[in-house]
Amino acid sequence: HIIVSGGIGVATFPALAETLIQKCNAAPEVILAARSKHLILCADEFRAMGCKVHIATDDGSAGEKLYASRMLAKLKPGPNCRVYVCGPMIMMKTTSEVAIAAGADCVVSLEAQMACGDGACLGCVVESKSEKEGEKMVRVCLDGPVFDTTLIDWDAHNMAFDR
């Protein structure tokens, strides 16, 4: 298992790492990516659990100067690997592409503005690749927030709004 987080996307991953350690008897590898070293979170917490931590920063101020997707490619996930991703949409898209190309299973945890929290307002929808009527748009609040990355239509999302 490999956990990939961008910025505050790391928030729920310590709990996931603990669960994976308990259920699989092995600590996942963790990629922590951020714009700079001051934005890297939870590295010591993951190390204390026995996780191997890889740090990637956009400016090279900590770890390696590269994006999360490139770090994942260096780890060479394979068909027996599951990759868990949370962070900016563009990071999740590119990291998912690397995982899928390597034959790994990949899930993403999406974030969206959720006005109602029960799916009625449709404020948190993202497009899926489903061709079935009524399944083209999925609600992050009700259908997610965790999705198999192959179900998300990444090309339908305007990444420019995710800054």
Place the predicted regions along the sequence by residue.
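Local cysteine-cluster metal-coordination motifs and their immediate loop/turn environment
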Residues: 10-12, 89-91, 111-146
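FNR/FR-type flavoprotein reductase catalytic core
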Residues: 1-113
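Short, surface-exposed amphipathic charged segments that create phosphate/polyanion-binding patches used
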Residues: 67-73, 120-125, 155
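Short Fe-S-cluster ligation motifs
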Residues: 48, 126-127, 138-163
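Short secondary-structure transition/capping segments
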Residues: 24-26, 77-81, 106, 130-136, ...
